[in-house]
């Protein structure tokens, strides 16, 4: 019992002298004989809460949180102000997935001993699990103020800061975590994630390398290293093979690692290696990020193997509106196989896709589904038809606006006074890559020479762009008239040229067969491939790529020069 007596003497010295984690570390080395003696002491002295607390800790670290709760509740009944027991009880409640009870325990521990750091730390962990990032950040900082050398608090603070996009601060926190425990792989990997978010790609690779030096089978580090190398490869193409090798290492280390398969799929698809990429793309359904859109159907998945003659198949949208527009083209091929075809898409696309060849019925998502023999998500159709770069179907116009909407827009726009150019410069603000792919209008305006008839087809103009739009009276703002994609399609047809960033509008305009110039950020989406100015998916598209992330002067200068050539202005008659 010497170890027990020494530990309890330390606890008795006063508030803040011993933390929960230190206690766990000390009892981890106790022999079974010590625990047997402690159990006997607990029987002989049932009112001693410390004995019950230590037994509860042992149950907690032995993976028995239910038993820990029982023992710790008894300890607290004898000693309600036992902050270390309250902390342990909170941990046990969290392990049993009882977050509200866990939070109450941590709050009581803080109340009884506000000088302890670990109740703040464990409460921060609970807040983190609930997605309450800002509250978690506050508690991690409280923990660090009391325990400056608690490595895991610095590490987890960095993770929370990364979650809210405060990457420079995350780098600072994770750098401190690495200093405190340089021989542990996890902080190095997490530092790499923060550096990646801050755009410091080379340093991110170095951090992942250090993590892999410590743990060569660290699948997450290998996967993240692949992502950083892949983004570096936009400026340094020779890094692509190393990125793919990193994904392979992640898969070898963790054969069911869906994120590595997903990232490798995106890389292969972006390089046009469709034969390898489409099968791997099916791993998307195992990703946590896809759980909200994964669906169960009463019919089997069709991936091209079964005959569709005389069968009914449901094709359904799954991701963005642009994806539905891009991949609905396969409907005609499905119908040619003798199928009765039902196409389910977002309600805003139903009217537009009525012009598509192939579907017998187009329905809005959420409507009652007819009986079907098979189903297929739209982005699985390229796999089903073994698509490669030379057999992409319907690369020219495959959608058209309703004739009555076309007449309406022709009348609304009136006679053309000069070459008419439609503009879209930003996409959905909620898109995870919006800060890279969208433009500020003031960035675009200097590259739009006067003399053209510009039409803003930007449905939602952001507050910061309104003043700049009003300052250019030669740009007609028609965004408020675009009630759905049928209206937008009719407006597009009345343009001589569409200039857009990478949004669903780009897919719509190109699917209509209209000349569409697309400004692409670096890195760009896999759908636009690499190192080319055209798209095999859309004959009428022309791509203006960034070569350096965030640098729009290059692609916009090329676009302005091309505009003079493609749509030369003629002098008005005298």
What are these model-predicted stretches?
Residues 1-497, 502-574:
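Alpha-helical solenoid repeat scaffolds of the TPR/TPR-like class and their adjacent stem/linker regions
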């Amino acid at each position: 019992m010497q170890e027990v007596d020494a530990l309890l003497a330390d606890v008795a010295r006063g508030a803040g002298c011993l933390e929960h984690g230190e206690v766990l570390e000390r009892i981890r080395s106790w022999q079974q004989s010590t625990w047997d003696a402690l159990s006997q002491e607990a029987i002989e002295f049932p009112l001693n809460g410390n004995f019950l607390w230590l037994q509860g800790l042992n149950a907690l670290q032995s993976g028995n949180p239910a038993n820990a709760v029982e023992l710790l509740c008894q300890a607290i009944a004898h000693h309600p102000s036992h902050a270390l027991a309250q902390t342990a009880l909170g941990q046990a409640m969290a392990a049993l997935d009882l977050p509200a009870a866990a939070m109450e325990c941590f709050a009581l521990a803080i109340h009884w001993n506000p000088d302890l750091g670990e109740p703040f730390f464990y409460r921060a962990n609970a807040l983190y699990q609930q997605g309450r990032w800002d509250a978690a950040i506050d508690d991690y900082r409280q923990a660090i103020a009391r325990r400056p050398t608690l490595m895991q608090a610095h590490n987890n603070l960095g993770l929370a800061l990364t979650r809210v996009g405060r990457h420079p601060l995350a780098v600072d926190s994770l750098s401190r975590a690495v200093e405190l425990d340089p021989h542990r792989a996890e902080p190095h990997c997490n530092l790499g994630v923060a550096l990646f978010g801050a755009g410091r790609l080379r340093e991110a690779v170095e951090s992942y390398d250090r993590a892999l030096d410590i743990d060569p089978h660290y699948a997450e580090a290998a996967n993240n290293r692949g992502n950083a190398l892949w983004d570096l490869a936009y400026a340094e193409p020779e890094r692509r093979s190393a990125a793919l090798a990193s994904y392979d290492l992640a898969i070898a280390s963790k054969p069911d690692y869906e994120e590595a398969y997903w990232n490798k799929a995106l890389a292969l698809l972006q390089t046009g290696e469709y034969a390898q990429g489409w099968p791997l793309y099916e791993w998307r359904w195992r990703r946590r990020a896809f759980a909200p859109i994964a669906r169960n159907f009463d019919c089997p998945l069709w991936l091209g193997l079964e005959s569709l003659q005389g069968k009914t198949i449901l094709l359904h949208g799954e991701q963005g509106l642009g994806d539905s527009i891009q991949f609905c083209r396969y409907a005609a091929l499905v119908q040619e196989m003798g199928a009765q075809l039902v196409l389910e898409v977002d309600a805003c696309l139903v009217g537009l896709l009525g012009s598509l060849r192939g579907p017998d019925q187009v329905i809005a998502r959420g409507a009652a589904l007819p009986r079907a023999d098979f189903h297929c998500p739209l982005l699985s159709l390229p796999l089903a038809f073994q698509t490669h770069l030379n057999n992409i179907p319907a690369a020219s116009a495959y959608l058209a606006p309703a004739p009555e909407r076309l007449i309406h827009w022709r009348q609304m726009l009136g006679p053309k006074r000069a070459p008419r150019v439609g503009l879209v410069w930003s996409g959905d603000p909620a898109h995870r890559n919006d800060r890279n792919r969208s433009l500020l209008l003031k960035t675009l305006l200097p590259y739009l020479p006067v003399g053209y008839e510009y039409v803003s087809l930007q449905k939602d103009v952001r507050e910061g762009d309104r003043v700049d739009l009003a300052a250019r009276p030669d740009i007609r703002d028609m965004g408020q008239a675009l009630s759905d994609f049928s209206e937008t399609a009719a407006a597009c047809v009345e343009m001589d040229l569409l200039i857009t960033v990478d949004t669903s509008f780009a897919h719509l305009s190109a699917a209509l067969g209209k000349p569409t110039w697309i400004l692409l950020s670096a890195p760009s989406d896999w759908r636009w491939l690499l190192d080319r100015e055209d798209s095999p998916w859309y004959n009428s598209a022309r791509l203006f790529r960034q070569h350096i992330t965030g640098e729009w002067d290059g692609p916009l200068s090329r676009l302005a020069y091309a505009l003079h050539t493609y749509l030369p202005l003629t002098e008005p008659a005298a």
